[in-house]
Amino acid sequence: GEQNVLTSDPVVYFNQSSGSTGKQKLIPVTKRVRKVRSRVTQQSLGFMTDAAIKHGLEIGKMLLTTSIQIRDRTSGGIAYGTSSVGDLRNMDFLYRQVFVHPYDALKPADSTARNYVCLLFALGNPQMRVIGANFPILALQLADYLERYAEDLIQDIENGTIASWLKLEPEVRQTLEKQWNKLPHRAA
């Protein structure tokens, strides 16, 4: 986190490399980098929206189950983690409206709890159209969650509950429960 070594701009986050070429590295991210990435994302969304409209497809909401948990902080107090975590944590209110679930559904540290609540909100929303994932295997994992927890998901949709056995942080559970309603017609 030492200033003016790799960039003259203040570092706001470090992307952590995968380590596929050796030791994991921390790559500095600045406000300027985030601004450029945001523009690229906006352009990508524009192309995707345009293509969907041209093909007569409805534009809807996206299911994404990626964690927004940072890995840790440097000795200088700067957060670091995967680039997707950094991007998701930096999203403004407008971007967050793309999700079929509340942004807080990405907060659980426990992956089963996070995937479950994201799927729960997705199953309750008829506007769900897209599954976003960093890797194709995640789609198969979501299918496994659907199969494994089908009865609990249906019960929660019908009753407006969130399974008590999920390892959710109390404040996250409270926030999500306030945003969740029973939808018996979706459970039928």
Regions found by a protein language model. Give the residues of each.
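Active-site phosphate/ATP/adenylate-binding loop shared across adenylate-forming ligases
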Residues: G1-A188
